[in-house]
A protein has these predicted regions:
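Sec-exported extracytoplasmic/periplasmic mature domains
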Residues: 3-11, 25, 29-34, 93-101, ...
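Extracytoplasmic/secreted proteins, especially bacterial periplasmic and envelope-associated proteins
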Residues: 1, 15, 19-35, 84, ...
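Acidic/histidine-rich, surface-exposed loop or edge segments in extracytoplasmic proteins
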Residues: 1-10, 68, 109-110, 168-173, ...
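Acidic/histidine-rich catalytic neighborhood of metal-dependent amide-processing enzymes
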Residues: 73-188, 211-214
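A mature extracytoplasmic/lumenal domain signature
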Residues: 39-41, 56, 68-72, 109-111, ...
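Structural recognition of the beta-strand scaffold that forms the well-ordered cores
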Residues: 37, 51, 63-67, 106-109, ...
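A non-catalytic alpha/beta surface segment that caps or lines the substrate-entry region
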Residues: 1-59, 203-205
């Protein structure tokens, strides 16, 4: 829907951006949630993060955030980047609907992740994370779902930032978990839970945030606010040939493998939602 029907969605395609936000709200409502918007103005236009909340039981003040950005760069329909991440958030929200979990789980679709707003105060996730910090929210962990749908069995299909080149496989058939050093406990817990649920290939790294690519999504905003956060990704530009182009279309994605990743992420959320599991 986001890539195939709505297409490019950003401040310069504002009608499409708003249709995307409404679509996400409708899907969350259909799954049994009250969809809420966090709205802020930019260029005299209202922009929205869209949120659904599964209230926790015994540890409701502790919060787990599962997020993905729904905007695209100009000229790009954004199937992998990042309709795939949004689809995963919506599917996971549906799976957890009506459940009881100790910690509160927030499912959030962020606006304005892409340039020129990337890593600025106008990034939707920065607005969200800063508001959470101002309220004193206790975020136990944040997962940024960023480009989840492209996989290859070809040798040489996977590349890396220079600082870690040669340390990981050169075949792009895995999902990646990436965190900064301060979030290593979150990453290790997520990795254990994922591997207990599925045998899908997983590579993980807790590395300095200064390495190029490590902070390239909404988890970066939560690091800036002092929260533990990690990115779940197929590595986007380090693997995907159509990154930020008009050819980032739904036919490029591997939906079977994406489904396996979502299964593993369900287990990750189940683990993080229970303190000390």
């Amino acid at each position: 829907m986001l890539a195939g029907t709505i297409g490019e969605r950003n401040l310069w395609s504002y009608g499409a951006l708003e249709r995307a936000a409404q679509y996400i709200s409708t899907q969350l409502t259909t799954s049994g949630y009250t969809a809420r918007r966090q709205t802020f103005d930019l260029a005299k236009l209202p922009l929205s993060n869209v949120e659904a909340v599964l209230e926790g039981t015994t540890r409701a003040a502790e919060i787990v955030i599962i997020g993905a950005h729904y905007d695209t760069v100009a000229g790009c329909p954004g199937a992998n980047d990042n309709a795939s991440g949004v689809a995963a958030v919506l599917e996971l929200a549906q799976r957890f609907s009506g459940q009881s979990q100790p910690r509160t789980i927030r499912f959030v679709a962020f606006v304005n992740e892409e340039p020129p707003f990337f890593q600025t105060a106008h990034m939707g996730s920065a607005v969200y994370a800063n508001a959470a910090r101002s309220r004193g929210d206790r975020v136990a962990g944040m997962l940024s779902l960023e480009s989840l749908g492209y996989y290859s069995e070809e040798k040489g299909s996977q590349r890396y930032p220079a600082a870690i080149a040669g340390l990981y496989p050169d075949v792009g058939n895995f999902i990646g978990f990436v965190s900064n050093l301060a979030s290593v406990r979150l990453l290790l817990r997520a990795r254990r839970a994922f591997r207990r649920r599925t045998s899908f290939p997983l590579q993980s790294a807790a590395v300095p945030a200064a390495i190029p690519g490590v902070g390239w999504s909404d988890h970066w905003a939560f690091w800036q606010a002092g929260y533990p956060a990690m990115m779940v990704t197929d590595t986007a530009p380090f693997r995907y040939p159509w990154y930020h182009t008009a050819d980032d279309t739904p036919d490029k994605l591997d939906y079977d493998r994406l489904a396996h990743v979502i299964d593993g992420l369900e287990a990750v959320i189940e683990s993080i939602a229970v303190p000390n599991r």
